[in-house]
Amino acid sequence: QARAWWSPSGAGLWMSTLLRPKCDRSIWGGIALVAGAATRRALTALGADEIELRWPNDLYARSRKLGGILAESKDQSAGAWISLGIGINIDLKNEELREKAPDGLSDRIICLREVSPAAESDPGKIALAIIEELRPLYGQFQQGEKLGDILGGDLSVAGREVLVERPGKPVLRGTATGIG
């Protein structure tokens, strides 16, 4: 879905890393969830609380969006790769949100400072913590471990109503029990 990410200059962390997975390409779609789990764990280790990883690639706190993960893959003559992008709102000023945010957005986003004022807010330290958390999870992912085992309790989908939308087919509704 062509959605835009908005955050004022200097108010967050936006990072990208290039991955060259050796695992079967059919499972590459799970890498955004793996990165989301790593990001959630890193933020929690740095003092943030109330952080939820929501399907398929969003980080929420207090029912508002804190950040997101984007994974795009490419096949080229030099090999296949995934560009993994992570964005986190760290310090958004309320007046800046009201003045500059696109219509209706200021009520739907939140920043790390608002959620956990004492949490680490240095973008460099947060980026390093994310990479340190991602490294072992990415290794498990490449070794073919089940996504549900890698994520553990990081994904906040269990017990929630979910919809499955398929082109040209009826929408399926159900209650999520986890991820396989």
Language model features by range: what are they?
Residues 2-23, 31-35:
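DPxDG-like acidic metal-binding loop motif
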Residues 23, 29, 33-50, 61-180:
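Long, positively charged amphipathic alpha-helical accessory segments at protein N-termini or as interdomain linkers
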